[in-house]
């Protein structure tokens, strides 16, 4: 499906749900109240593994899953678990840095988080983006435009890095989101997933992890929205297993 068709589908879908928009707003507020707000994980930097060569550098940047909501420390969250997996693959130490913030979209990642990135070159960059572009109803055109800009910034500043991108959220599996808001957001998440698959295809050393079909969601959730420590471990392992097929470590 072309970008224009996705955009048209998004606009028509918005028009269709407009009559129940007040109900959806109330439903969303109630769900947010039920979920509450988890704290960020502690210790956003670390080193894992060992090897004869100097440590490689991994940057993990993005939304609440990058901030580690649902885990006690980043070592047990997405950043640390991804670094552990990379270290095992390259048989070398990985120096990892996490920059995450709850609620950020791709645009806010550019504006608010990228200025915080250390002035150094990274060998690997993992973008944990997409959940809030779904939750905050970014259109397909906005999603593509902002992600292409973010990928371009990463590439311009880290020309030799491999860029990995986590999947758009698996909202359909969330045990806390009620219908009809779950179905509406899931349809948008699937649309953003297909969109990013299309526009990253053929990009040099840019790898997107499509919405998975092989993740066991038993014990995955901390609060119904964010992963638990087990969820982060399983998620990172599944992503890296997918990247193994497309990236030569």
Model region roles, listed by residue range:
Residues 46-49, 87, 115, 153:
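Short, flexible, glycine/charge-rich loop motifs used to bind or transfer phosphoryl groups or to couple energy/partner
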Residues 114-249:
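Alpha-helical cap/lid subdomain in secreted, periplasmic
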Residues 55-59, 65-146:
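Conserved SGNH/GDSL esterase-like catalytic core that processes O-acyl groups on lipids
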Residues 62-64, 217-218:
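Short glycine/proline-rich turn/loop motifs
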Residues 1-59, 240, 244-247:
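N-terminal secretory targeting modules
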Residues 51-53, 91, 158:
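Short, flexible coil/linker segments at domain boundaries that flank nucleotide/cofactor-interacting
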Residues 26-29, 103-105, 170, 213-215:
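Residue-level detector of flexible, active-site-proximal loop/helix-junction positions
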């Amino acid at each position: 499906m072309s970008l224009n068709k996705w955009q048209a589908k998004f606009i028509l879908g918005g028009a269709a749900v407009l009559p129940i928009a007040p109900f959806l707003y109330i439903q969303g507020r109630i769900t947010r109240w039920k979920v509450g707000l988890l704290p960020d994980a502690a210790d956003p930097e670390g080193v894992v593994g060992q090897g004869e060569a100097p440590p490689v550098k991994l940057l993990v940047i993005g939304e609440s899953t990058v901030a580690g909501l649902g885990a006690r420390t980043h070592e047990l969250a997405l950043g640390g678990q991804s670094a552990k997996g990379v270290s095992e693959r390259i048989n070398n130490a990985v120096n990892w840095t996490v920059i995450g913030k709850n609620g950020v979209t791709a645009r806010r990642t550019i504006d608010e988080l990228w200025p915080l990135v250390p002035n150094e070159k990274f060998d690997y960059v993992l973008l944990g983006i997409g959940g809030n572009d779904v939750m905050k109803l970014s259109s397909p055109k906005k999603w593509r435009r902002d992600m292409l800009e973010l990928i371009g910034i990463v590439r311009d500043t880290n020309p030799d890095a491999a860029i990995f991108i986590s999947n758009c959220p698996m909202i359909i599996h969330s045990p806390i989101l009620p219908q009809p808001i779950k179905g509406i957001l899931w349809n948008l998440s699937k649309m953003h997933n297909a969109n990013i698959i299309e526009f990253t295809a053929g990009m040099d050393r840019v790898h997107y992890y499509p919405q998975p079909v092989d993740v066991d969601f038993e014990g995955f959730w901390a609060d119904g929205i964010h992963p638990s420590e087990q969820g982060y471990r399983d998620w990172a392992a599944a992503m890296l297993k997918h990247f193994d097929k497309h990236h030569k470590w």
